[in-house]
Amino acid sequence: TNAIRAEISRISNVDLNNKKLPYDDKKVIFDRGNNTWHADSSFKETPSKISILSAREVPEEGGGTDFIDARYALETWNKKPRKYSLNDLKNCICEHSIVYSRMNNTGDIFDDKFKQDMPYVKQKLIRIHPYTKKPAFYAGSHCSHILGWDKEESRTLIKEINDWIIEAGCIAKHEWKTGELVLWDNRRVLHRGTGYDESKYRRVMHRTTVAGDMPSYME
């Protein structure tokens, strides 16, 4: 039998030799992309359902994590005049890509092999939570476009959805203390890092994600 191997990602500006990385290090730049609203691993064919983040070393200022509810945004979508109704959107399939999201906020830091290894993947725009049976938007910064739509038209809509998630909801702000652990449901919640002075402070976070049960477009 194959052993289950737990994988822990380091979100950090400190290397494995405990040396602080320079501000322009590719790892630091890559992690800086986490400061935009996203759902963890939505760029994977089977996205994560749960994220577990623990603080090993925190900066004196900044370095927090914000959370926002994407279900409430869907429930209040009709509070404003909309070109597209929820009925228009309920069967939409989007493509997500970490290369797309990072190109938009950190620039092109990837080699050709990484781009080939991380192709666009399909995700539902509206997901039904398997336990609550309630729908929520599934967008965020990794969400590129809607399949079968004009690309720019769909990106305008995705921006409208992402903007409304923030405008409609209340942001829950978490300021970390060393040793704390927080977990959340990526099927309902978007999150982002708040940033910190990477040239001055050290930050070491360990993250584990729990894979979902299937690709969202098959749910």
Name these PLM-found stretches.
Residues 1-183, 187-219:
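Fe(II)/2-oxoglutarate oxygenase catalytic core
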